């Protein structure tokens, strides 16, 4: 049997990882400035993470949600404490798409309505409702096309026009669009959106799958705007590579048996991984570190990268050029051995390093980028010599 290959694969086989570094089967070292799509939050093979998972596996790795699993409540308590959402409830699942699927389903159950307001450029996953709310027709199958979705720009008047129809169960928004190219709605827009949802009786779902867990310098990116969504989707950095997702649910939304369900969600190992992540975020003060390193990275890029725009917050950064970045990205990997990401906009380079990335590792990336950008753009642009990153 062969794999059903849906990804274009680079010819690299990682066999070891530690912190922000990977090694392939030939012994070549790589710098991870992408974290496997924002998944690696506390660094590869963090000792506390490895210990937590090892100890849990030596006791019990899995049993179904038909029995008492105290580590689930331990995780819920810790997540509420660290995130500032202690009064919310937690439903656990396995991925970001599944989290968004359950968020949308919960909103529809709660309101008795079905229409969803989503935003241009959004990505919420590849399952039924989540992909319907994703602004990419190429990945929406005919089977997924019958959902009632209204895509709008970041325009409060346009949002209100849809809400006035009276059939909207929820608005779902990424506080920072990841796949879309690190696009940020303004804090004022998020505040206005929250007010409109409340006015018209629709739930506000914050998709924090990529932007959450300290990535923006706050635990959740929407906290920069001071809003409190009704439902918050989490995954990716939540497990640092172990499959886990979830939704944080406002106390006004009540649970009933059978409303949502999962076989593997919230298993013992997944909860151990998620607890380890929260413990390391706290113990190593990674929110402050992400803020500090993010500020340093963006200020250096703004001064020296020759870009049209530097986007993002914390360690969720987009670099927009006036030319396609494919060649730069390919050479960062093949010549400088640095993993970075791309976006749906071919001119945007996406950076999502571990939250504990060091200044020396940031400088290594910057020097490689400046060299390649100078070469890539020299035929079309006059450029001054780049400045070395500040030490």
Where are these regions (language model features)?
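Conserved N-terminal phosphate-binding loop of PLP-dependent enzymes in the Aspartate aminotransferase
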Residues: 1-391
């Amino acid at each position: 049997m062969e794999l059903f290959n849906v990804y274009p694969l680079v010819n690299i086989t990682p066999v070891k990882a530690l912190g922000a570094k990977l090694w392939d089967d030939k012994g070549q070292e790589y710098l991870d400035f992408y974290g496997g799509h924002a998944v690696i939050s506390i660094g590869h093979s963090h000792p506390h993470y490895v210990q937590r998972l090892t100890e849990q596996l030596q006791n019990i790795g899995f049993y179904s949600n038909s029995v008492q699993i105290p580590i689930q409540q331990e995780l819920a308590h810790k997540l509420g404490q660290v995130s500032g959402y202690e009064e919310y409830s937690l439903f656990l699942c396995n991925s970001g798409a599944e989290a968004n699927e359950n968020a949308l389903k919960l909103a529809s159950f709660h309101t008795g309505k079905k229409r969803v307001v989503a935003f241009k450029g959004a990505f919420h996953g590849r399952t039924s409702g989540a992909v319907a709310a994703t602004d990419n027709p190429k990945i929406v199958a005919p089977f997924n096309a019958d959902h009632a979705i209204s895509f709008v720009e970041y325009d409060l008047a346009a949002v209100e026009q849809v809400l006035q129809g009276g059939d909207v169960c929820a608005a779902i928004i990424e506080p920072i669009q990841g796949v879309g190219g690190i696009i940020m709605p303004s804090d004022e827009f998020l505040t206005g959106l929250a007010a409109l949802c409340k006015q018209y009786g629709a739930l506000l779902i914050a998709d924090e799958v990529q932007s959450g867990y300290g990535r923006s310098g706050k635990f959740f990116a929407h906290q920069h705007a001071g809003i409190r969504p009704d439902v918050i989707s989490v995954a990716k950095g939540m497990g640092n590579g172990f499959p886990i997702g979830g939704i944080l649910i406002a106390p006004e939304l009540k649970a009933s048996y059978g409303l949502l369900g999962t076989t593997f969600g919230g298993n013992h190992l997944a909860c151990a991984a998620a607890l380890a992540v929260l413990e390391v975020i706290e113990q190593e003060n990674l929110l402050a570190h992400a803020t500090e390193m993010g500020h340093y990275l963006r200020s250096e890029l703004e001064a020296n990268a020759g870009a049209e725009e530097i986007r993002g917050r914390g360690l969720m950064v987009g670099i927009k050029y006036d030319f396609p970045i494919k060649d730069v990205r390919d050479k960062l990997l093949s010549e400088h051995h640095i993993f970075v990401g791309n976006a749906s906009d071919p001119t945007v380079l996406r950076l999502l390093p571990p939250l504990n990335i060091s200044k020396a590792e940031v400088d290594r990336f910057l020097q490689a980028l400046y060299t390649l950008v100078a070469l890539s753009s020299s035929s079309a642009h006059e450029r001054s010599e780049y400045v070395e990153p500040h030490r």
